[in-house]
From Swiss-Prot:
The active site is at residues 85, 152. InterPro entries: Aldolase_TIM, TIM_sf, TrioseP_Isoase_bac/euk, Triosephosphate_isomerase, Triosephosphate_isomerase_AS. Its EC number is 5.3.1.1. Substrate binds at residues 6-8, 158, 188. Belongs to the triosephosphate isomerase family. This is Triosephosphate isomerase. It comes from Campylobacter curvus (strain 525.92). It is found in: Cytoplasm. Homodimer. GO terms for molecular function: triose-phosphate isomerase activity. NCBIfam families: PRK00042.3-2.
Length: 229
């Protein structure tokens, strides 16, 4: 099972060094863990987890103020990227056109892409979730070999309100009809609900936000998944 930690706008270079030290001391070679860190916390050290980028601009380098490109990611050996997270779609206004440009650039370079999709509460309550997700995935090549799709219902992100196991199973089952890529769930995942989520047939892992920001909490979540699978 894959465990992806999205640290978002949390951790400094110093605090992440301590975070990484705790993970490295407790993870095993069998654990499939990735951590998406703030740019300032990138390091070139060997870890028992994979480092990933929360964002990038589809360029090697150039006149793109405030952005980071392939040249900077290459310096740290980073080749795993998040694309389409709802906070970048909703708060920062990333368009489908930009998301497609990011996807195409990442795919051209053979990067691992974690492509995030998810509906807001109004779409969910109107029963339009599946068609909404079909449209979002229609923007990319779902046959890309190094693709992972993360389903994150917007109404569950950072709210403490996770989708039910039945809801997650239904949506991941639907997404399986659209792609053969590994499927993840994200949205208020924690140590208390990971066991139930881990038992969902099409769930290949989780994209964890708040519950991953503390290294010990994240390790407890991983351990809880083993106990309850």
């Amino acid at each position: 099972m894959k465990f992806l930690a999205n640290l978002k706008c949390n951790h400094t270079r110093a605090s992440f060094a301590e975070y990484a030290k705790i993970l490295d001391a407790n993870l095993s070679a069998d654990d499939d863990v990735s951590v998406f860190v703030p740019f300032t916390a990138f390091d070139a050290k060997e870890h028992k987890f994979k480092l990933g980028a929360q964002n990038f601009y589809p360029c090697v380098s150039g006149a793109f103020t405030g952005e980071i490109g392939k040249a900077q990611l290459d310096e740290f050996g980073i080749s795993s990227v998040l694309i389409g997270h709802s906070e970048r779609r909703e708060i920062l206004g990333e368009s489908e056109r930009l998301l497609r440009a990011k996807f195409d650039f990442a795919a051209k370079n053979g990067w691992q892409i974690i492509y995030c999709v998810g509906e807001n509460l109004s779409v969910n309550e109107a029963g339009g979730t599946k068609e909404f997700l079909r449209t979002q995935l229609g923007n990319i090549d779902t046959g890309y070999a190094n693709l992972i799709v993360a389903y994150e219902p917007i109404w569950a992100i950072g709210t403490g309100k996770s989708a039910s196991a039945e809801q997650i199973a239904e949506i991941l089952g639907f997404l399986r009809t659209l792609t053969l890529a590994p499927l993840l769930y994200g949205g208020s995942v924690n140590a208390a609900n990971i066991g139930e989520i881990a038992r969902i047939r099409e769930c290949g892992g989780v994209l964890v936000g708040t519950a991953s920001w503390d290294a010990t909490n994240f390790l407890n979540l991983i351990a809880s998944s083993r106990e309850r699978i």
